Amino acid sequence: MRRSTVNGCAVSFCHQPNRGDCLNEIGPIGYEAAHAHAERLFRQLLPACGLTVREGQIKLCHTMLDALYNKEVALCDAGVGLGKTYAYLVACILWQLQRPRPLRSPVVISTASVALQDATLQEYIPFLSRVLIQYGYIDTPIRAVLRKGKERFACDLRLQERRLQIAQRGERFAHRAALLREVGRCLDLDHVAGLSRYDRRHICVPTHCDRRCAERESCRYQQYLRESNGPTITIQVCNHNYLLADALHRQNGWKPLLRDYQALVVDEAHRLPEAAQQMATCRLSTQGLAQLAQQLSGLHLTRAAQQVTACARALAGVYAPQQNEANAGHGDLPPVQVPFTVTKDGTLALAALQKTLAEIQDTYRVRLTLPLLHQLKEMRTRAAAFAQPDDTTVCYVEYSGIKSGPGLSHLSLCAVPRDLPRQLYDLLWRQEKPAVLTSGTLAAGGDFAPARRQLGLEGGTPDRKSVV
């Protein structure tokens, strides 16, 4: 597969048996025809190109087609090696063909693992694309794109600045200079092995891009966005966190991260609640405060940095005793989590933090960057939430066993919403778009009830189930 800013699928033909009554770029197809084409693909055409006929795979595809055509959610418990990826790819593509070409929208495939994303883009989609072209189902390759956070891509302007800095440091930095030259050829930072975290942080696309940027027209990242949101994209692939972030943007009326889509596939669906909890958790950490202090110090706001560091140490001093008490008699390792309790000392430390952050905002507003102002405001909001927690969240203290800085224990105050399944329903299922959820662990003993509850599907969402 050709690597580019958008993952286009190169087409190469497998051995072509007698085409017989094969189609020439089929037009819109209906429900019955879609099921008939699924049978033909899995029993004749795909086996002719090297795949094995699997009855479970065919059953899955029919269940998925039913859900897509009836605007339902399909819950599919299917083990490893059954071929569920081809099942949902075929179902989605046949379902897309029900509409005239100008009215087709992409589908989104969300997974939990990078390995599955890579396999989908580099193996499954190219193979299926050439088979469908060979037998006249489509006349152009399936175009799929990997969508992920902007911090994983290079900013051309920041890259130029960083390369200039490294070039001035001589031969000792030759290896880093070579890596930065490679970034000039590869937009995706995840594909540049050996790149340090420090360099990544200094060359990635910033949180807020300046619309007046001199490089905007030639910017590779902007080109990637234009191509990703173009009309020729059939499939968008992302991870669960990116899917949920897009849903959150839509819920809040912000600019969506994904192009509007007509159906959703969630592979490794048992990992979706975990991703939702990770994103919904309100977290105030000593590590975050230490990083804030470093940013302030970088702007030569030494006094402000010292104030934030003092607040972080005070917070660690209040909650570190819980670590020691809970661990008494159980060795040197701290527990991962302990319940959060409201104490007088804790309330005072959180109040002092809120006051300090507010003073920094007011005193240095002109010198602070917009992202830093947002960060200060967000930390104030979190500190206030822990100073007066309510019944809508479950609060705890989390320890990592490492240090955030000299004499500073790394701990986080965490708050998880109690109504997480309801939030998932509001984010993903309330819109009543058809969806396919698949995993090898959705049905415990054939019972989907626990998974439905965790996934937020108990709000009246119509669904159909399949165990293969």
Short names for language-model regions:
Residues 69-74, 105, 234, 433:
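Pre-Walker A (Motif I) flank of P-loop NTPase domains
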Residues 106-114, 136-154, 260-271, 283-291, ...:
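Conserved beta-strand -> loop -> alpha-helix junction used to position metal-binding or nucleic-acid-contacting
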Residues 24-47, 55, 99-236, 240-241, ...:
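A substrate-engagement module of RecA-like helicase motors
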Residues 206-234, 247-255, 359-468:
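A contiguous, basic/glycine-rich beta-loop/short-helix subdomain that forms a polymer-engagement track
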Residues 88-90, 94, 115-118, 122-126, ...:
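Signature of the SF2 helicase/ATPase Hel1-core->accessory helical subdomain module
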Residues 52-68:
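N-terminal pre-P-loop "Q-motif" helix
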